[in-house]
């Protein structure tokens, strides 16, 4: 096709489109793909297509500058698109991703996107851009069923040409496969094959919207692992912690296992179940702690955790290997310090976290639901996302000490890949006074509890009063006090016995005198208290008064014996009494004292 004819054809074609945003004229500027180098990566279960496009402004009498250009996707692949990104070649990827917006072209099928250029393109000027697309579920297993010992083969169908609304002068295509074992592939333009690479082209003067089926059938044993459903829950606490939990449903979407599964062959033969999945690695944030991994049965102990400088690597090994068509479900959770992800200025808060995190290499997520539980009282909630997400109505979540519920943001998205591992920012306002709500609730709850107990024990809930029962309760209370005082008085005697023994060893008369004085003082006080309690028993008309009186008399005799024992010890130390005589006298005193104490014990038991 000659150049003037090509330009005329292009102008007629572009005349049916709406003008590009920012165009100076009512007609779209005439553009052409001067050179296209496509790379189709089929080495995993994803189809990654990267195109380096040299876009040229033809001019052709038009003085309008091009501020944007159009991208098109084949109707056969448009439904499988997971990611589309465009950037200027040679510039930093993160800072120079171009703005892409979906649009429609009247009379044309497929999906179209408008890409805004960083700088308007003058007539005759050129710009090199890189277009990256990722497709999911486009590699179809063929055969669809295999045995445990067979290898997996897949079929991919695409386009030999770069599908574009603009004509293309020259283009090439390189296909990277998962292995060198290729059953068949299309032969358009006599492609060259080297190991696991197929090279097509160059194709010259390709008209716009050109399509020619490209098909390849080859061996691909990479893990066809797909997350069919995933729920990611992020619970934010202003007390320093962010809890993350992920509920994951996994499925092997490769060729379905045909026939029985042999664990013996699987362990013995290295190539048995070569396309199955034994384990995979999940990358958690570097600050992750308290990590757990469980399924429906419980904790799975076959997992391993490796803490690195910039991440935490978790090897997840399901309870059984995954073959084609097999499914499993598991839960992973961990805690994060909030100071790394939560920022605030006054009452303004911003939570910056990933919408989806790394689950495994070359991940595919069919359906993702993200729930972000904010603190109770959060208001004016807004979300900034690097890509389009859908929002469901906000929910309320109730947990300990909540009164009106915590707001829950519910967002979801379908067909996600690794390129979607990006941060979202949740903005909200929160009155810091509300942080005192839960501590005050705890204090109030304990106050009410103690106050209720106090009131309860002081109230009389009996229907009729029983004077006899009240009298018995009073007598029992007085008796309990008498028992306590008697035990203390017996303890005084034992303490004085120890003082006498120390005196016999040290011969220090001051020690003995001090012990006597202490015994007299404390014994007098205890005896007086018991006498008062005895009078109260008499007032209540209890017959226990006589028993207490008898016990007092017996105690007086015990005291005399205790003091007599001290006198004997003084005579022994002074040399006025022989040791043999002292031992005989001490035996007599101890025997009488034991008889008296036994009688007192009987009286106490009767009380």
From Swiss-Prot:
Origin: domain of life: Eukaryota
Family: Belongs to the OST1 family.
Function of the protein: Subunit of the oligosaccharyl transferase (OST) complex that catalyzes the initial transfer of a defined glycan (Glc(3)Man(9)GlcNAc(2) in eukaryotes) from the lipid carrier dolichol-pyrophosphate to an asparagine residue within an Asn-X-Ser/Thr consensus motif in nascent polypeptide chains, the first step in protein N-glycosylation. N-glycosylation occurs cotranslationally and the complex associates with the Sec61 complex at the channel-forming translocon complex that mediates protein translocation across the endoplasmic reticulum (ER). All subunits are required for a maximal enzyme activity.
Record bears the keyword Thylakoid: no
Entry keyword set: Acetylation, Endoplasmic reticulum, Glycoprotein, Isopeptide bond, Membrane, Signal, Transmembrane, Transmembrane helix, Ubl conjugation
Name of the molecule in the record: Dolichyl-diphosphooligosaccharide--protein glycosyltransferase subunit 1
Principal subcellular localisation of the protein: endoplasmic reticulum
Pathway membership, UniProt: Protein modification; protein glycosylation
Entry keyword annotation includes Membrane: yes
């Amino acid at each position: 096709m000659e150049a003037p004819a090509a330009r005329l054809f292009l102008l007629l074609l572009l005349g049916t489109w709406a003008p590009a945003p920012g165009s100076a004229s009512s007609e779209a500027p005439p553009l052409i793909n001067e050179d296209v180098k496509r790379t189709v990566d089929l080495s995993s279960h994803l189809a990654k297509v990267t195109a380096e496009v040299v876009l040229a402004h033809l001019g052709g009498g038009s003085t309008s500058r091009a501020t944007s250009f159009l991208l098109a996707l084949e109707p056969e692949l448009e439904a499988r698109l997971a990611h589309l990104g465009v950037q200027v070649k040679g510039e930093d990827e993160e800072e120079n991703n171009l703005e892409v917006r979906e649009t429609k072209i009247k009379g044309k099928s497929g999906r179209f996107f408008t890409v805004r250029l960083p700088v308007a393109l003058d007539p005759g000027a050129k710009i090199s851009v890189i277009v990256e697309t990722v497709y999911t579920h486009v590699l179809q297993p063929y055969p669809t069923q295999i045995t445990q010992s067979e290898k997996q083969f897949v079929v991919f169908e695409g386009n030999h040409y770069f599908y574009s609304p603009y004509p293309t002068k020259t283009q090439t295509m390189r296909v990277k496969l998962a292995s060198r074992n290729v059953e068949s592939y299309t032969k358009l333009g006599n492609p060259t094959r080297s190991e696991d690479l197929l090279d097509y082209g160059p194709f010259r003067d390709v008209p716009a919207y050109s399509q020619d089926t490209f098909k390849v059938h080859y061996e691909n044993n990479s893990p066809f692992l797909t997350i069919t459903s995933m729920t990611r829950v992020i619970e934010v606490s202003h007390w320093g912690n962010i809890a993350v939990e992920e509920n994951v449903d996994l499925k092997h979407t490769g060729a379905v296992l045909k026939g029985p599964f042999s664990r013996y062959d699987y362990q013995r033969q290295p190539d048995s179940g070569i396309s199955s999945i034994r384990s995979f690695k999940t990358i958690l944030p570097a600050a992750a702690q308290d990590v757990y991994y469980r399924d429906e049965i419980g904790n799975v102990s076959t997992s391993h955790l490796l803490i690195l400088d910039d991440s935490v690597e978790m090897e997840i090994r399901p309870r059984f290997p995954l073959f084609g068509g097999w499914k499993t479900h598991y839960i992973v959770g961990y805690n994060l310090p909030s100071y790394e992800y939560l920022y605030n200025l006054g009452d303004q808060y911003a939570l910056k976290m990933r919408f989806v995190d790394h689950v495994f290499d070359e991940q595919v997520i069919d359906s993702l639901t993200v729930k972000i539980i904010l603190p109770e009282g959060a208001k004016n909630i807004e979300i900034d996302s690097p890509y389009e997400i859908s929002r469901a109505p906000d929910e309320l979540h109730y947990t300990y000490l909540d009164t009106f519920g915590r707001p829950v943001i519910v967002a979801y998205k379908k067909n996600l890949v690794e390129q979607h591992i990006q941060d979202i920012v949740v903005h909200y306002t929160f009155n810091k006074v509300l942080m005192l709500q839960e501590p005050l609730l705890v204090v109030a709850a304990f106050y009410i509890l103690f106050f209720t107990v106090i009131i309860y024990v002081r109230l009389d809930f009996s229907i009729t009063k029983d004077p006899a029962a009240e009298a018995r309760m009073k007598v029992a209370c007085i008796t309990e006090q008498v028992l306590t005082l008697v035990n203390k008085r017996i303890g005084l005697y034992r303490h004085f016995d120890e003082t006498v023994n120390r005196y016999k060893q040290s011969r220090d008369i001051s020690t003995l005198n001090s012990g006597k004085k202490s015994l007299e003082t404390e014994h007098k006080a205890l005896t007086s208290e018991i006498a008062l309690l005895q009078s109260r028993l008499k007032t209540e008309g209890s017959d226990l008064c006589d028993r207490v009186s008898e016990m007092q008399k017996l105690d007086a005799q015990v005291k005399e014996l205790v003091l007599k024992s001290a006198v004997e010890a003084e005579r022994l130390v002074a040399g006025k009494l022989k040791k043999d005589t002292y031992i005989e006298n001490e035996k007599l005193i101890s025997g009488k004292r034991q008889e008296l104490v036994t009688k007192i014990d009987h009286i106490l038991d009767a009380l």
